[in-house]
Regions:
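A conserved structural motif in NAD(P)-dependent oxidoreductases
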Residues: 203-214, 225
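Short, small/polar-rich loop/turn modules that mediate ligand/substrate recognition or access, typified
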Residues: 89, 175-182, 229-231
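Short C-terminal tail/terminal secondary-structure segment
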Residues: 2, 148, 219, 230-244
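Substrate-binding pocket helix/loop in short-chain dehydrogenase/reductase
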Residues: 99-100, 104-112, 138, 196
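Catalytic loop of short-chain dehydrogenase/reductase
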Residues: 137-162, 167-176, 190-191
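Conserved glycine-rich cofactor-binding loop
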Residues: 9, 16-18
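Alpha-helical segment proximal to the catalytic Tyr-Lys
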Residues: 128, 172-176, 227
Length: 244
């Protein structure tokens, strides 16, 4: 299938490894120009070198996307380097595990900043640029916890559902305004990433998803044929959730 996004400009945060890297590789395969952001300079340089070797134009910024000014800086970089911004993949690492009643206010606020407000800020910064030419695709990578809470991941459960509620509302606003911009969530279940290893889920390796496959799902949500997919939370979990 031709996704119709060759020569489009995409910004991917958290794009140096894991699910974000899967999205980067999938978009690069479609001929998309890339702006990559991550905190780890070495991993970011490696990802950029890989897509450059494949003939893809790329710009990078080493940045902590949870800082309030970071999203606007990234959008500005895309416009300065490539003249536009068409696609945003908002991805940030998950918060630490913990039981709900053990969490203090500071931990909850930090999770909301990283896994809700960071994406909100990025969307707000990107929409005016996309609306200028009447086309845009925004995909926030969250978690399958938006449909079924995951035990001991209370921070993630809370922040991800908050983002889902905000994004669903914002997607309807974008449609009502006739912007040509869609906003969707890609909600992964267990995938073979460093995050899963940190959570001690190595024993599940045989039943985990491949980040490369997940990246192709993200690329579809960011494609031209996905123009009628808006305000959706697409769960990619191999059937792990029991929620309808």
């Amino acid at each position: 299938m031709d996704l119709g996004i060759a020569e489009r400009v995409a910004l991917v945060t958290g794009g140096s490894r894991g699910l974000g890297r899967g999205a980067v590789d999938a978009l690069a395969a479609e001929g998309v120009k890339l702006v990559l952001a991550a905190r780890a300079e070495g991993a970011l340089a490696e990802a950029a070198a890989a897509v450059t070797a494949a003939g893809v134009e790329v710009a990078t910024m080493v940045v902590d996307v949870t800082e309030p000014e970071a999203p606007q800086r990234l959008v500005d970089l895309a416009v300065e380097r490539f003249g536009s911004l068409d696609i945003v993949v908002a991805n940030a690492g998950g918060p630490p595990p913990g039981r709900a009643l053990d969490l203090d206010d500071a931990a909850i606020m930090a999770a909301l900043n990283a896994n809700l407000l960071t994406s909100v800020r990025l969307v707000r910064s990107a929409v005016p640029v996309m609306a200028e030419h009447g086309w845009g695709r925004i995909c926030c990578i969250t978690s399958y916890s938006v449909v079924q809470p995951i035990p001991t991941l209370a921070l993630s459960n809370t922040a991800r559902v908050g983002l889902w509620a905000w994004a669903k509302t914002a997607a309807n606003d974008l449609a009502a305004d006739g912007t040509g911009i869609t906003l969707n969530l890609a909600c992964p279940g267990p995938h073979a990433t460093e995050r899963m290893r940190q959570l001690g889920n190595d024993s599940m390796a045989g039943s985990m998803g491949d980040p490369a496959d997940f990246g192709k799902v993200v690329a579809f949500l960011c494609s031209d044929p996905a123009r009628f997919v808006n305000g959706a939370a697409l769960v990619v979990d191999g059937g792990a959730t029991l929620a309808l």
